[in-house]
Amino acid sequence: MIRKRANWLVILFFGELLTATAMGFFEKEIERAVVLALFVPLIISSGGNSGSQASTLVIRALALEEIRVRDWWRVMRREVLAGLALGSILGAIGFLRIALWAALFNVYGEHWFWVGLTVGLALIAIVLWGTLAGSMLPFVMRRLGFDPATSSAPFVATLVDVTGLLIYFGIAVVVLRGTLL
């Protein structure tokens, strides 16, 4: 039991080391718009949480034989809609929170709207990506002969952490160009 879990944790640990690489890639942007760093935990945890949730639901459905590996396409279509809906809900809440704090406490500066838009759009994209990754990885793990229950959710969290940073800062570069960046 320990060996099986330790192997995955070590693999995932090395995967998480890539988060520093991803953030380093956007070091200049973070330097110019430090406010972006404030939302990194919110962004990556939302993607990881949505992915883990989707992964758990698919693993359960596979275990109960409600779905089979060949049903991956049907599951993916359903999860795209779910990811967009959930991402839109969290994106709207994220934007509204930034707008409220900007109005009440005058934080985030004169470009608060663009920061809020960046966070909102990033949440939509990352929750969609997390949901898709989380729903598809159990199928991949099962197909490769691994136990999806021990590997999928942690792998999803690691994958979404690293790629979520790339998505977030990529959106920031596009949205904030000419204002904060």
What are these regions (language model features)?
Residues 141-160:
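Interfacial loop-to-transmembrane junctions
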Residues 25-40, 106-118, 148-149, 181:
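Membrane-water interface of transmembrane alpha-helices in multipass transporters/channels
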Residues 1-3, 50-77, 141-143:
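Non-transmembrane, extramembrane segments of multi-pass ion/lipid transporters
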Residues 169-181:
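Juxtamembrane boundary at the C-terminal end of a transmembrane helix
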Residues 38, 52-63, 138-142, 153, ...:
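Re-entrant/interfacial helical elements at transmembrane boundaries that shape
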Residues 1-40:
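Cytosolic regulatory modules rich in charged/polar residues
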Residues 72-93, 97, 102, 107-108:
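Short alpha-helical transmembrane segments in multi-pass integral membrane proteins
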Residues 8-16, 39, 43, 47, ...:
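Alpha-helical transmembrane segments in multi-pass membrane proteins
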